[in-house]
C-alpha cells in the first residue's frame, strides 16, 4: 500500500477519508501522527488553503499528500462562514460553539431563506514540488435548521438539513453521508483522477 499523509488534525475528517481511501490501496496517515504541525491557512479560498496544507505536509514528510479544505457557505450570509467555518466562533472555537453562533446569527432569517452548501476541496500532491496537483471540488446543498438534530457526523451536521433525505446530515449513517456529501463527491472525483493516471 502507498503511504500518503493526510494534511489535517481533524479526527472526523481522518476517520471519514481513511476508511474510504483504504479500499484503493492508500495507507492514510494523519499528519499529527507524523509530528507535522498544521500549515498556516492564509489563502482566501478553499482551493488555496487545501494546496497550502498539502504542500506543507508533503514538504515535511517527503510523502505524497492529500489535503481537504471544506466549510459551510450560507447564502443569506454571503457565503459565511466559508473558509472560516472551523473558527467561526473565534480562536477557541468548538463544533458546538460554531453551531450555536450560526443558529444565533440566523435566528431571524425566514425558513425560505436558509439555503446553504457544504463545500469540500481535496488536493493530491504527488510530491512537495508537484506542478500539477489534482484538485477536486464537491458541494452539497441543504437548509440550516432552527435546532440541532442527530448525533452522527461532526461540525455543522446537526443543523444541516438534507431535503432529498428528509433529515439532517447528523441523522444519516456514515454510508449514506459518504454517498452524497460534499466530501464524498470530491473523493469520488479524486479516486477517478488517481485511477486514470
From Swiss-Prot:
Keywords: Hydrolase, Magnesium, Manganese, Metal-binding, Nickel, Nucleotide metabolism, Nucleotide-binding. The active site is at residue 69. GO terms for cellular component: cytoplasm; cytosol. Changing residue 69 to A: Complete loss of enzymatic activity. CDD domains: HAM1. Its cofactor is Mg(2+); Mn(2+); Ni(2+). GO terms for biological process: nucleoside triphosphate catabolic process; nucleotide metabolic process; purine nucleoside triphosphate catabolic process. Substrate binds at residues 8-13, 70, 154-157, 177, 182-183. Its EC number is 3.6.1.66. Optimum pH is 10-10.5. Optimum pH is 9.0. Reaction rates under neutral conditions are <40% of the maximum. Changing residue 8 to A: Greatly reduced ITP pyrophosphatase activity. One of its GO terms (molecular function) is ribonucleoside triphosphate phosphatase activity. Binds 1 divalent metal cation per subunit. Maximum activity is obtained with Mg(2+). Activity with Mn(2+) or Ni(2+) makes up 60-75% of the maximum rate. Modified or damaged nucleotides such as 6-chloropurine deoxyribose triphosphate, 8-Br-dGTP, 5-Br-dCTP, 5-Br-dUTP, 7-deaza-dGTP, 7-methyl-GTP, N6-etheno-ATP, NAD, NADH, FAD, ADP-ribose, UPD-glucose, AppA and ApppA are not hydrolyzed by the enzyme. Pyrophosphatase that catalyzes the hydrolysis of nucleoside triphosphates to their monophosphate derivatives, with a high preference for the non-canonical purine nucleotides XTP (xanthosine triphosphate), dITP (deoxyinosine triphosphate) and ITP. Can also efficiently hydrolyze 2'-deoxy-N-6-hydroxylaminopurine triphosphate (dHAPTP). Seems to function as a house-cleaning enzyme that removes non-canonical purine nucleotides from the nucleotide pool, thus preventing their incorporation into DNA/RNA and avoiding chromosomal lesions. PANTHER family: INOSINE TRIPHOSPHATE PYROPHOSPHATASE, INOSINE TRIPHOSPHATE PYROPHOSPHATASE/HAM1 PROTEIN. Homodimer. This is dITP/XTP pyrophosphatase. It comes from Escherichia coli (strain K12). The gene is rdgB.
